[in-house]
Amino acid sequence: MKLLFYFPFLFVLLHASAQHKKLFIAAGQSNAVGMGDSALSKMYASAKTFEYRFTGDSLKALTDPVGYSELHFEKANTGSEWPAFASEYSILTGNEIIIVQAARGGSSCNNKAELNNYGTWDEKGNLPLFDSAVIKIKAAEKKTRTKVGGIIWSQGERDANAINAQQLTAAAYQVSLETLINRFRKALGAGVKFYIIQTGYYIHHPREGFDAVRKVQEAISKQMKDVYIVYNETGSFEDRGWMKDEIHYNQPALNDIGRKIAMQIIQTEKKKL
């Protein structure tokens, strides 16, 4: 598993002499949308962080609630990990950061796990989301004249529940996630990096399906090039008191995710220099 570890003293500004833009995609289901508290993410407001809005083809300051109800995607209710992520990344690199939010609560990776019109990232389903994501991403690339720097993926809870319900196998989930990564790379470029926030647990529900999803995510990070687990602490959130409810992360958790994935992503980029 390509799991990275952060040591504070290792990080320096990568591009101190010039201003650069970085475009990141926030994709997945409800914990990617964000179900936290915007009052607890306000401290991450920055003049160098932005969100792309497809409606109106515009950039806006990145503040919670991040996201917009467009192209079947949703906005945070009311806090997310993205202000903390973008702020930390910008501080450590000096770059301007643009977030493209492409997440929908309850969406599945495999269409066998899809619930009604909650959406799926699979090739077929009641509400396929992939094409909408690509439309939004390409519009953002054109607007900012910047290619995607990476896709940050927070998803798996819906598929874990389907595995628990014996509607889906772990092997089928793995195929669907691998296929999704390859579809993104075909649409956006073969070198697009895929960063996984490892799925946590559903309190008071069986863990078997969630363990299966977590193991698949680890396996894919070992087997596929430029796929990384950039956060693996979600399994301890219940013990830390970092759950908003049985399935969603609270704002302290989201802030922690945001800061640490910024550090980990920078570390992957430094290794490529």
Q: Which residues does each predicted region cover?
A:
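Cell-envelope and extracellular/periplasmic
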Residues: 19-273
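Bacterial Sec-dependent N-terminal signal peptides
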Residues: 1-20
